[in-house]
Amino acid sequence: MMSLSVRPQRRLLSARVNRSQSFAGVLGSHERGPSLSFRSFPVFSPPGPPRKPPALSRVSRMFSVAHPAAKVPQPERLDLVYTALKRGLTAYLEVHQQEQEKLQGQIRESKRNSRLGFLYDLDKQVKSIERFLRRLEFHASKIDELYEAYCVQRRLRDGAYNMVRAYTTGSPGSREARDSLAEATRGHREYTESMCLLESELEAQLGEFHLRMKGLAGFARLCVGDQYEICMKYGRQRWKLRGRIEGSGKQVWDSEETIFLPLLTEFLSIKVTELKGLANHVVVGSVSCETKDLFAALPQVVAVDINDLGTIKLSLEVTWSPFDKDDQPSAASSVNKASTVTKRFSTYSQSPPDTPSLREQAFYNMLRRQEELENGTAWSLSSESSDDSSSPQLSGTARHSPAPRPLVQQPEPLPIQVAFRRPETPSSGPLDEEGAVAPVLANGHAPYSRTLSHISEASVDAALAEASVEAVGPESLAWGPSPPTHPAPTHGEHPSPVPPALDPGHSATSSTLGTTGSVPTSTDPAPSAHLDSVHKSTDSGPSELPGPTHTTTGSTYSAITTTHSAPSPLTHTTTGSTHKPIISTLTTTGPTLNIIGPVQTTTSPTHTMPSPTHTTASPTHTSTSPTHTPTSPTHKTSMSPPTTTSPTPSGMGLVQTATSPTHPTTSPTHPTTSPILINVSPSTSLELATLSSPSKHSDPTLPGTDSLPCSPPVSNSYTQADPMAPRTPHPSPAHSSRKPLTSPAPDPSESTVQSLSPTPSPPTPAPQHSDLCLAMAVQTPVPTAAGGSGDRSLEEALGALMAALDDYRGQFPELQGLEQEVTRLESLLMQRQGLTRSRASSLSITVEHALESFSFLNEDEDEDNDVPGDRPPSSPEAGAEDSIDSPSARPLSTGCPALDAALVRHLYHCSRLLLKLGTFGPLRCQEAWALERLLREARVLEAVCEFSRRWEIPASSAQEVVQFSASRPGFLTFWDQCTERLSCFLCPVERVLLTFCNQYGARLSLRQPGLAEAVCVKFLEDALGQKLPRRPQPGPGEQLTVFQFWSFVETLDSPTMEAYVTETAEEVLLVRNLNSDDQAVVLKALRLAPEGRLRRDGLRALSSLLVHGNNKVMAAVSTQLRSLSLGPTFRERALLCFLDQLEDEDVQTRVAGCLALGCIKAPEGIEPLVYLCQTDTEAVREAARQSLQQCGEEGQSAHRRLEESLDALPRIFGPGSMASTAF
């Protein structure tokens, strides 16, 4: 805990520095207004705008407010400031490097998405941080250069001083000696001036301190109506402000923030005056504070004691900027801008869109001109804006006219984000990502595109030429959630997609999907004539929406998707409106291959009728792809359906279930028409998104589970590993009714393994009715990963801990590691469960969440388009959609119930430890102990995350789970004996006690009966961090996790299990003897008590003798403590133990702690003892006063000041109040 130290002539009581909790990575520095108060402090509402220093130039500011250059250098002071400055710059670099690594990780994780605009924004942030890092490194090198020059001048000055002293002390000699003396004196003066000049130059590189007033805290000293004046002096810089205490507990100040330029040789002087009348002012206190500790990367909340008793505290939020305001680089605020997740959240908020950039306007104009050149019709104005911060649909007026900036909606603070960001004006620019080479998405089209993946600014011709030669790579296949069609039209507007490539005739009907495992590349000619007419349709109606075609057999690996790919054999070469058909033969060795050829005949733009033809191949696994033969250049395209050799339609029922359950497939070649086939409603938008997203296929966590609504694309030939593996065209019992629609795309390697693994379910005939297939999907059981149905204990514990960490964010830098590990654990759990939707803690807005946000656009249209005959009364579609949309479809789990239970215990233990943080006053042992335990828990979570690859593999021994940093024989063997025939992650304490007694009971019982049980109970209590009940309790007993066992053993000094048992047995025997009722046994134990054996329990037993023992025992204990305290190791251990006793709930324990501190004469205990004299009960106050008298001159002086203050002021707290007020 860093504290704001004061000048040597003044001592501060409990001067505490906390990290500001207002820094959360969401709100920028200008957005952290008075609404975010300091812990439970009331809100400050200044009546007017804060008085900020005017924006002066650097020279005028330095001459007007800065400290003048010193005439005498102070190298010692400069060394201290330089060390603190380097520490602050290093922290700045580390914070920004961590942010850079997180952004790069987000880029890697998001590359399966089609949000290329979002990736581009991440890339801009990364480059901005890189520029700022280079600026920081240059700034640090400049400071190092100045310091090295200063050190050189210092050595020269010291040498000149030695020369002058040598000539001066000696007898005056010749003229040459006098000349040499004058030369040395002149050199000394020059070096002194050079050092002063370098000091001023270094002082100019210190940056700025931004001070924000948080308020006064004063217990009973602050009354309603009181007025205070605070005057701060820092060199020649001043800040004076006045405030008033309102009746509602609010404090109103006439000024809120200011900027101080750091100085090398000055201290910050703070004077607080209470204004009681026109000429009656009472000075509350005046202090001078050290400022070198304020060079920190993160904002800090400084709590300064104004008076000696600490009854008046001033709270300031101090933020250090390494650069001056006039010297700020453009990228200096890269980490301080709104976080990436916040920007994504505001993207999908219901706010007006941003004005499109010049690149977008040029793109829209180019598309419009291209359409007019082709058929003279205007391009649809209902295309969606591709701006990353725009709303989902834009009218033509909104797209081409300026719109007001949306208010950034700030979510809750995030655990994964590095804080201290500042806003940055978003701008559009060229995408410089990997996917920029292949703008077309995985299924070859993007009618629901969110980003402009590739826009050429050169000319329309260059853009068309570029689009004609682009090919699709594996990365583009892995990206891009792209719903099959648009939502229903709104108020007369008609759906019209924004194609990601520059061809307006890009295909919008083929929405068959593909996996990313062993991805067989499949391409599609975009500029087909009938698709152009679909894009240019202007009449609204359900019949205008092209219907997607899907094949849904269990392991059917077939689809013909469309992309712009020149070298692919399944490509239509387009010249103008002429289509050259190319026939390609698709051969597979798998059991089933479905070739789907969408047959669409468009007679006019107002009568677009989707009629997909579904074909099932025979077991010969050989079929010929359809030949696309354009009949005329008038945008009428007919497609010859492939020959069907198997009369059974495979999997069409499920497709109809997801889109329109009222139109079953009657024959393999029968075209199915659906007037509401594409009906995006608030409950079906996610479903449609998953049906057409290439990154939505079967969950990798369940082997043999295939994607129901989508199939991977088929290249020229596709070979399956096991051609004889049975396949089922409907969901097997292992399937979840909602899982195939919501599972994200796993890693390519995972999908490769999955695609080659056979399905364990037996082959069954395909259902021929969509309602039947949907009913089967709904009735399938939902497996629970935690072993129980709907067990959400792990998810609840994780959410509770992240919510608790949000309350302490920024106050304790030690918690950053824990927060990172908790966020990492959550991401691993969600990744394992196949969850890509956002949680409230991480706000990772994915495509599913985005489509859910857009579903409100089509609520009215869905109601208008729903015909009573289109949906049967008993249709279970609503239930299926609810199960699909439900964010709690599957609880988070590691796949191992025992590991889940162990994690739950650790997460709740962390939440309990967090409650011990943030206490007010000098009693901080419990807080320090809790922070130490939290650091250990962070290492435990890190070990669990590192173990994530083997979560589902049953561990047979503790050696497979944890590893000690040093060799500790016997410990893991003992744990394996405890968990024999049990899971190695958890063990009941009764089982540990029984195993310990069986192994060590015979040997320890020889020394004293029951010693083995006492040793094991002490071990368990130390490992668990809590006392065990002495009597059996109802309900499940306490359990010890392998990670608690491992973490505790790592802290021990004993090298082996045998040595630990022996040492602990000696300590337990000593404590028993000290607590004996026989005075002779107690005195004998005191005489023979070795220094090394007196640990926490032994020291507590000694201190209790100072309260409960007779005079002879008390004298012996005092003598023993004084003699043992001469050793530094024992003194430190005893000091920590006795200070910890001051925070115990038992009054007698606190009294014993006070008396023990007096025995060892610890000046470190003066401040806590003074605090107890003011706040605790009469018995504790009396013991504290007695101990203060024994703490030397300093303790006696503190006691005198305490008595004077208590005589002058009424009692602040009554007996037994034990104030634990927290800021």
UniProtKB/Swiss-Prot annotation:
<keyword id="KW-0597">Phosphoprotein</keyword>
<dbReference type="GO" id="GO:0016020">
    <property type="term" value="C:membrane"/>
</dbReference>
<feature type="region of interest" description="Disordered">
    <location>
        <begin position="375"/>
        <end position="411"/>
    </location>
</feature>
<feature type="modified residue" description="Phosphoserine">
    <location>
        <position position="456"/>
    </location>
</feature>
<feature type="modified residue" description="Phosphoserine">
    <location>
        <position position="875"/>
    </location>
</feature>
<dbReference type="GO" id="GO:2001107">
    <property type="term" value="P:negative regulation of Rho guanyl-nucleotide exchange factor activity"/>
</dbReference>
<dbReference type="GO" id="GO:0051683">
    <property type="term" value="P:establishment of Golgi localization"/>
</dbReference>
<feature type="compositionally biased region" description="Low complexity">
    <location>
        <begin position="546"/>
        <end position="564"/>
    </location>
</feature>
<comment type="function">
    <text>Downstream effector protein for Rho-type small GTPases that plays a role in cell polarity and directional migration. Acts as an adapter protein, linking active Rho proteins to STK24 and STK26 kinases, and hence positively regulates Golgi reorientation in polarized cell migration upon Rho activation. Involved in the subcellular relocation of STK26 from the Golgi to cytoplasm punctae in a Rho- and PDCD10-dependent manner upon serum stimulation.</text>
</comment>
<feature type="compositionally biased region" description="Low complexity">
    <location>
        <begin position="505"/>
        <end position="523"/>
    </location>
</feature>
<dbReference type="GO" id="GO:0009611">
    <property type="term" value="P:response to wounding"/>
</dbReference>
<dbReference type="GO" id="GO:0071889">
    <property type="term" value="F:14-3-3 protein binding"/>
</dbReference>
<feature type="modified residue" description="Phosphoserine">
    <location>
        <position position="459"/>
    </location>
</feature>
<feature type="compositionally biased region" description="Low complexity">
    <location>
        <begin position="601"/>
        <end position="650"/>
    </location>
</feature>
<dbReference type="GO" id="GO:0035024">
    <property type="term" value="P:negative regulation of Rho protein signal transduction"/>
</dbReference>
<dbReference type="GO" id="GO:1990869">
    <property type="term" value="P:cellular response to chemokine"/>
</dbReference>
<dbReference type="GO" id="GO:0070062">
    <property type="term" value="C:extracellular exosome"/>
</dbReference>
<feature type="compositionally biased region" description="Acidic residues">
    <location>
        <begin position="858"/>
        <end position="867"/>
    </location>
</feature>
<dbReference type="GO" id="GO:0031252">
    <property type="term" value="C:cell leading edge"/>
</dbReference>
<dbReference type="GO" id="GO:0005737">
    <property type="term" value="C:cytoplasm"/>
</dbReference>
<feature type="region of interest" description="Disordered">
    <location>
        <begin position="856"/>
        <end position="889"/>
    </location>
</feature>
<feature type="modified residue" description="Phosphoserine">
    <location>
        <position position="874"/>
    </location>
</feature>
<feature type="modified residue" description="Phosphoserine">
    <location>
        <position position="22"/>
    </location>
</feature>
<dbReference type="InterPro" id="IPR026136">
    <property type="entry name" value="RIPOR3"/>
</dbReference>
<dbReference type="GO" id="GO:0090316">
    <property type="term" value="P:positive regulation of intracellular protein transport"/>
</dbReference>
<dbReference type="InterPro" id="IPR011989">
    <property type="entry name" value="ARM-like"/>
</dbReference>
<comment type="similarity">
    <text>Belongs to the RIPOR family.</text>
</comment>
<feature type="modified residue" description="Phosphoserine">
    <location>
        <position position="349"/>
    </location>
</feature>
<keyword id="KW-0333">Golgi apparatus</keyword>
<feature type="region of interest" description="Disordered">
    <location>
        <begin position="475"/>
        <end position="769"/>
    </location>
</feature>
<feature type="compositionally biased region" description="Low complexity">
    <location>
        <begin position="380"/>
        <end position="395"/>
    </location>
</feature>
<dbReference type="GO" id="GO:0007266">
    <property type="term" value="P:Rho protein signal transduction"/>
</dbReference>
<comment type="subunit">
    <text>Interacts (via N-terminus) with RHOA (GTP-bound form); this interaction links active RHOA to STK24 and STK26 kinases. Interacts with RHOB. Interacts with RHOC. Interacts (via C-terminus) with PDCD10; this interaction occurs in a Rho-independent manner. Interacts (via C-terminus) with STK24; this interaction occurs in a PDCD10-dependent and Rho-independent manner. Interacts (via C-terminus) with STK26; this interaction occurs in a PDCD10-dependent and Rho-independent manner. Interacts (via N-terminus) with 14-3-3 proteins; these interactions occur in a Rho-dependent manner.</text>
</comment>
<feature type="coiled-coil region">
    <location>
        <begin position="89"/>
        <end position="114"/>
    </location>
</feature>
<dbReference type="InterPro" id="IPR031780">
    <property type="entry name" value="FAM65_N"/>
</dbReference>
<feature type="modified residue" description="Phosphothreonine">
    <location>
        <position position="355"/>
    </location>
</feature>
<dbReference type="GO" id="GO:0005829">
    <property type="term" value="C:cytosol"/>
</dbReference>
<keyword id="KW-0175">Coiled coil</keyword>
<feature type="compositionally biased region" description="Polar residues">
    <location>
        <begin position="565"/>
        <end position="592"/>
    </location>
</feature>
<feature type="modified residue" description="Phosphoserine">
    <location>
        <position position="351"/>
    </location>
</feature>
<protein>
    <recommendedName>
        <fullName>Rho family-interacting cell polarization regulator 1</fullName>
    </recommendedName>
</protein>
<dbReference type="Pfam" id="PF15903">
    <property type="entry name" value="PL48"/>
</dbReference>
